[in-house]
Amino acid sequence: MSENLKFENIYCVGRNFAGHAKELGNKIPTSPLIFQKSNSAVNINETIEIPSNKTIEHELEVVLLIGKEGAPKNREEAHTFISGFSIGLDLTDRHLQTELKKKGMPWFASKTFKGSAVIDANFIHECPQEFYLTVNQKIRQEGNLKDMIFSFEDIILHLSKTVDFKKGDIIFTGTPEGVGALESGDQIEMGFNNCPPKKLVVI
């Protein structure tokens, strides 16, 4: 599926796992917390480039590929808008994000720098229940879909109140607990259980 892939809008969901909300000292939301990354943030390569003077943290997430135009009317129709599932990293400049939050400002600059939307472009048609991230062969994050506060359908329906979807839109659906900083030379492996992983190197 990766050969002819053209991404459009990139939507992201914050605090969709209670454990992650708690580890950052945030309240658990009562509706999906949506933010965006720019299209230029997409990184489907095998390398992650991080600035040497910044603390960039990984956030492992299931990524949805939207395959239909328009807006669904109900949960069943919402599911039909998903044409593929993959795994990705929402890279975050945590120090900048914290400063922006203190000032009551949007997170945009801390979330949408070049290469901050890392995606395995090999989308699959069924989503496994469990997913994971290792850094230097040590488990950093493990997630299970049953622990999501808002389901894929919840997220799509919530977004459709504001936007009409385009074919090629991407949704990062939230990260489980265990986020942490990346350093140059780190060897990363991310994937779904019992599926071929995506391997990356931090440079």
Where are these regions (language model features)?
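Switch II (G3) loop of P-loop NTPases
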Residues: T175
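Catalytic-core "active-site belt" of small-molecule-metabolizing enzymes
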Residues: M1-I170, G178-I203
